[in-house]
From Swiss-Prot:
HAMAP family: SurE (MF_00060). This is 5'/3'-nucleotidase SurE. The lineage of its organism: Bacteria, Pseudomonadati, Pseudomonadota, Gammaproteobacteria, Enterobacterales. Keywords: Cytoplasm, Hydrolase, Metal-binding, Nucleotide-binding. It is found in: Cytoplasm.
Length: 253
């Protein structure tokens, strides 16, 4: 199995390094990751400037000023030959639950892989300690995929409780919950008296009931949520069409 491994925490982050070490025990792994933390970069792609790369002695590649999406784009189309069999993103330091997936560079890297037609996993740890647990879970899933491919055409967003492996209760297939909208802005002044702004933490849990990714992780289970690239709200198409006709906009041209 050939794995393109990326993340949004940066090439030296403990999550990606722990996962790379574990994956290399049974797979051919190419790390292509940002040279710094790009958390919250979502699906941003660098189009107005060139990208430089640096290759470390162990073969890991850092994309200087690159986003997670840049890294997977370059990895698939230029840096990994032959091309990968699967794209894996993570292990993220902290969860990507509910609305987090909209902003997450970790999920975006997996989404870019899926966009190119590859199976893709996004892996996050609900904390900053037990990366070995998340790595073991990921390896188990990938070994299973080797034996029996999962032909859903979907991204698997995997969130792992920050627990020792022997305390993980199992795996649940979940849906995304939701958070309350975040509204905290933290102002500061620089030495010249100019105001600086920091975006605050994410909103608290809103929909975290049974069946959600929040609930599974809170209860000690690994959460796996299938995600899709197509954002079309198919069930709303007829509603929008009927509304356009009823207000007369749909018949103006």
């Amino acid at each position: 199995m050939r794995i393109l491994l990326s993340n949004d925490d940066g090439v030296h982050a403990p999550g990606i390094q722990t996962l790379a070490k574990a994956l290399r025990e049974f797979a051919d792994v190419q790390v292509v990751a940002p040279d710094r933390n790009r958390s919250g970069a979502s699906n941003s792609l660098t189009l107005e400037s060139s990208l430089r790369t640096f290759t470390f002695e162990n073969g890991d590649i850092a994309v200087q000023m690159g986003t997670p999406t840049d890294c997977v784009y370059l990895g698939v189309n230029a840096l990994m030959r032959p091309r990968p069999d699967i794209v894996v993103s993570g292990i993220n330091a902290g969860p990507n639950l509910g609305d987090d997936v909209i902003y997450s560079g970790t999920v975006a890297a997996a989404m870019e892989g899926r966009h190119f037609g590859f199976p893709a996993l996004a892996v996050s740890l609900d904390g900053h300690n037990h990366y070995d647990t998340a790595a073991a879970v990921t390896c188990s899933i990938l070994r299973a995929l080797c034996e029996e491919p999962l032909r859903t055409g979907r991204i698997l967003n995997i969130n792992v409780p920050d627990l020792p492996l022997d305390q993980i209760k199992g795996i649940r297939v979940t849906r995304c919950g939701t958070r309350h909208p975040a509204d905290q802005v933290i102002p500061q002044q620089d030495p010249r008296g100019n105001t600086l702004y920091w975006i605050g933490p994410p909103g608290g849990k809103c929909d975290a009931g049974p069946g959600t990714d929040f609930a599974a992780v809170d209860e000690g289970y690994v959460s796996i949520t299938p995600l899709r690239v197509d954002l079309t709200a198919h069930s709303a198409q007829d509603v929008v069409s009927d509304w356009l006709n009823s207000v007369g906009v749909g018949t103006q041209w």
